[in-house]
Amino acid sequence: VDGQVLSDYLFRKEISLSMAVENHWHGFIGMSPTANAPELFNLIYEKIFDPELKYDEFEEIRQDLLENQDKETILEKMLQRSPDRLLSARINELTGTGFARSSQKLSSEQIKNLNLDSIAAFYKKLYTNPQGTTYVICGNFNADTLMQQFVSVFGRIPVSSHLSRFSYPHFNFPVRKHIEGFPNDNDTQTLFDYLLPGHYQPGLKNTLTLKLMRDLIRNRLISVLREQKSLVYSPYISLMYEGIPQGIFYFDINASADNDNMPQIEQLLKEILHQLKQQEVDNEELNTLKRSFLIAKREALNEESPSAWRTALVGLLKNGETISDFDHYEQCLDSITPAMLREAFRRYLDTENYILLYLSKNKLKNDTSNH
């Protein structure tokens, strides 16, 4: 079928389908009215078993890569002109959530050896193996009817006894304190990301523990660094975690401050984290945080939010969390005690080996980078 004809047909039927390619996950994301679900299922089936291979377009792309190999890419130009983008890219490199920029370019030999048939064969082998494949269907529909339609299409996939296996090297965070700056034009202020990375065992309880740790740190950033000491502007902490395959996480404490305050901020951050390692948090504070988790979950996941359900369920899969644990979310959350959190702070955080990336016109005295 001509591509434009298919596109027009899908538009009329309100069907959309796109590929989702991430560092360690591949799949499809599709949406359609319930009445057109069989057509969506058949479209996915055809895509994985009989994809259209456009050799002419593939060759054009290859030649374009060869011609522009030694030229600066648009992304590289954007990075050089935007220190904050450089900083974000460096965070991804140092925490294992992205590839090093130096590894992203293919050599001329690698480009010449690219083969569309080999690429298609890899994806066909990946997508047509039911072992290790998970389908997530969310929406307002009759489950029995939809499952019959689903099975009538995907039940045709031959059974395989072989699970697709891929090996991933264990990601190692910097083994010592790493401090690196990027230039900006502000004479008096430093914008910084103070990163605390580590490895964890995937599972809902450990994920909730990390989220509680994040919010406990946030409370102290606001009360100590901003309200009591007035050292930072708009302090914020985020948590990134990736359960499968690496089991990695990092806390990112982000704020801006006057240049002269940076040494004091670093010392106070260490004191805050040291206190959380040594003392159990107050039950009242912990229970307040737990209630906020339950309220947020109730508000986000309801009968009118299929996309939120899809995001939540796919997140469980990617982070090694089970549906049964999620069914007992409240009990799992309630089981986390102040003593467990104190132990988690001790186990997960090394306050001496951290990553500090910053934007400043002035280089910090303790900068450990080579530039």
Spans of features found by a protein language model:
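M16 family metallopeptidases and their MPP-like homologs
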Residues: 2-50, 61-110, 130-138, 187-205, ...
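Bacterial peptidoglycan biogenesis and beta-lactam-recognition machinery
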Residues: 53, 142-144, 155-162
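Short, charged, amphipathic alpha-helices and their helix-cap/turn boundaries
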Residues: 111-115
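Non-catalytic, conformational "gating/processing" segments within enzyme and secreted inhibitor domains
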Residues: 116-153, 353
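Short, surface-exposed beta-strand/loop micro-motifs that present aromatic residues
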Residues: 121-125, 175-183, 344-347
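A generic structural motif
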Residues: 159-173, 237-238, 282-288
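Long, His/Glu/Asp-enriched segments that create or flank divalent metal/ion-associated functional microenvironments
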Residues: 223
